[in-house]
């Protein structure tokens, strides 16, 4: 807490992360409620539960891409603006309760969650560069606490907004967009402080599919060594449990 109060850049990054994470979590529970309100609610709720897990599959790849991103400061800012636009787009189409619209909203939610993981990876090198090594553990711990707080608070706020607006899903999506935009504006105002260690990345001719396969193979090897089970089987179990729960 002392680091948050005394270190201006860490405070800015933390506030931005809190707003961005809250924006990511606000719509999670609300989306399940929206799915349950559709005429095809059984398949809709099933899909809504599935898409909350799918971004996990891209976590390692997104983390690597975040490390390789050269303009981390600028990228964090524009990604937040993109997420804001995505939810404004949701707000404009969510009134139409058909399957095509619902499938489109599912894809937007997946993209937004993946982008949230990406921005989290972009913030980390900035923290590492600007905070002394002996304070990094405190910074990481407080960052995890903020993520946990934004998870609980974001979903609770989403339900409250939905209740007070009499299930106006478009209104909640607009509020969600506002959180992402505010997160980016905070960083834009302090963009000159967002310094980090520059990275040099060699141009690779490996395709996206090949990179994903290589990352998955490495993850599966590590998982088998530690758990003696297949990563794919464990993911399928998690998906089924999440859907049934």
Regions found by a protein language model. Give the residues of each.
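C-terminal ends and interior cores of transmembrane alpha-helices
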Residues: 81-99
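Helix-loop junctions on the cytosolic side of multi-pass membrane transporters
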Residues: 173, 178-204
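Short amphipathic helix-loop junctions that connect adjacent transmembrane helices
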Residues: 29-43
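Small-residue hotspots at the loop-to-helix junctions and early N-terminal turns
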Residues: 40-49, 141
């Amino acid at each position: 807490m002392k680091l948050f109060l005394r270190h201006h850049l860490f405070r800015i990054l933390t506030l931005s992360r809190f707003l961005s994470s809250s924006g990511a979590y606000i719509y999670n529970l609300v989306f399940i409620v929206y799915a349950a309100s559709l005429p095809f609610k059984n398949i809709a709720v099933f899909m809504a539960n599935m898409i909350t897990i799918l971004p996990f599959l891209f976590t390692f790849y997104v983390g690597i891409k975040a490390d390789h991103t050269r303009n981390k400061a600028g990228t964090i800012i524009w990604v937040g603006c993109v997420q804001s636009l995505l939810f404004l787009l949701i707000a404009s189409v969510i009134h139409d309760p058909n399957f095509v619209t619902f499938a489109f909203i599912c894809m937007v939610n997946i993209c937004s969650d993946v982008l949230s993981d990406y921005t989290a990876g972009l913030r980390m090198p900035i923290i590492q560069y600007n905070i002394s090594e002996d304070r990094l553990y405190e910074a990481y711990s407080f960052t995890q606490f903020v993520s946990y707080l934004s998870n609980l608070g974001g979903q609770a706020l989403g339900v409250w907004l939905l209740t007070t607006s009499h299930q106006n899903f478009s209104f909640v999506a607009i509020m969600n967009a506002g959180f992402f935009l505010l997160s980016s504006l905070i960083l834009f105002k302090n963009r000159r402080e967002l310094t980090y260690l520059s990275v040099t990345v060699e141009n690779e001719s490996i395709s996206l599919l090949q990179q994903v396969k290589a990352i998955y193979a490495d993850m599966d090897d590590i998982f088998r060594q530690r758990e003696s089970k297949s990563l794919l089987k464990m993911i399928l179990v998690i998906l089924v449990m999440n859907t049934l729960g």
